[in-house]
Amino acid sequence: MTIIRKKHPLIKIINHSFIDLPTPSNISSWWNFGSLLGLCLIMQILTGLFLAMHYTSDTATAFSSVAHICRDVNYGWLIRYMHANGASMFFICLFLHVGRGVYYGSYNMIETWNMGIILLFAVMATAFMGYVLPWGQMSFWGATVITNLLSAIPYIGTTLVEWIWGGFSVDKATLTRFFAFHFILPFIITALVLVHLLFLHETGSNNPTGLNSDSDKIPFHPYFTIKDFLGALILLMAFMILTLFFPDILGDPDNYTPANPLNTPPHIKPEWYFLFAYAILRSIPNKLGGVLALILSILILAIMPLLHTSKQRTLTFRPITQTMYWILVADLFILTWIGGQPVEYPFTIIGQTASIAYFTIIVILMPIAGMIENNILDLD
């Protein structure tokens, strides 16, 4: 078996990636989320495939086809709710994975980090298009509002929006193409994940100390396969509790009403995992400014390596920057809450304050904190 594992052209790639991979011995449970994201991706592709067998991407029948899946298909209700809540689990793992990367300075592995940002955008695009497919009220109006943001682009904006719509409003052509893109994107994401892993295995994993761990590496199997398996069990347990006991808790009741272009819902809002970015978008009165802030709220991650001023890689031994980091996390929770609130006082002012705080902490306060900590170290 050892000979095949190490000599076979295909199996040896798997061997070097998941079995004999030299791994830092001290990586904590925060390093579990990569494998959990892989598990989420596999679950989403499988449940999505079974849903696609029964779904019809036509405005006249899309809503009915989803109802048919839930009522008439064997375990269709389970597949549908696993897919819907699987997206939420995916984003929980994604946010924790990115948060871990920021905390432990993993952004210094620039190729891996940039690939991760591309993956984040791809997953967000996939989730957005998937939310449109059931063709409920929030699906329709969410698609209308978010695609309309592109009209803020000077000169080509309106033409671009109509090109994406395939007409002069969100209609049959839009739904059909969104289904096509929603189907193909997860496979593109899978390919990007392999590139992400390729870059990661060029440098090796980071670790909680941020120090070089070449002198203290252990094989990935069995130590971390067991650890990842435990993480997967915990994730699946939480996921099944969510899916079987609270399937609609993260959804919007408006999406159980068929799409009606003549009736606007009182509060148009995206799924919970986009609310922080939506709050940043709404906090700027100017349309183009809002769109730029929305894109920058994610793209700001790309300049994190440039904002790293500390002599130490991680935040493990940096209490001042740690404080800034946890204030940033609290700020993101506030933004998520504000994104789901109506546009009225005091929510608007809270949203604007939280949006300013978000960019200020990342661009100004954390780099300054890093420099202060450098000076404290020099004093010693």
From Swiss-Prot:
This is Cytochrome b. The keyword Heme applies. PANTHER family: CYTOCHROME B. One of its GO terms (biological process) is mitochondrial electron transport, ubiquinol to cytochrome c. The cytochrome bc1 complex contains 11 subunits: 3 respiratory subunits (MT-CYB, CYC1 and UQCRFS1), 2 core proteins (UQCRC1 and UQCRC2) and 6 low-molecular weight proteins (UQCRH/QCR6, UQCRB/QCR7, UQCRQ/QCR8, UQCR10/QCR9, UQCR11/QCR10 and a cleavage product of UQCRFS1). This cytochrome bc1 complex then forms a dimer. The chain crosses the membrane at residues 33-53, 77-98, 113-133, 178-198, 226-246, 288-308, 320-340, 347-367. SUPFAM superfamilies: a domain/subunit of cytochrome bc1 complex (Ubiquinol-cytochrome c reductase), Transmembrane di-heme cytochromes. One of its GO terms (molecular function) is ubiquinol-cytochrome-c reductase activity. The gene is MT-CYB. Disulfide bonds: none annotated. Its main location: mitochondrion. Binds 2 heme b groups non-covalently. CDD domains: cytochrome_b_C, Cytochrome_b_N. InterPro entries: Cyt_b/b6_C, Cyt_b/b6_C_sf, Cyt_b/b6_N, Cytb/b6-like_sf, Cytochrome_b, Cytochrome_b_C_euk/bac, Cytochrome_b_N_euk/bac, Di-haem_cyt_TM.
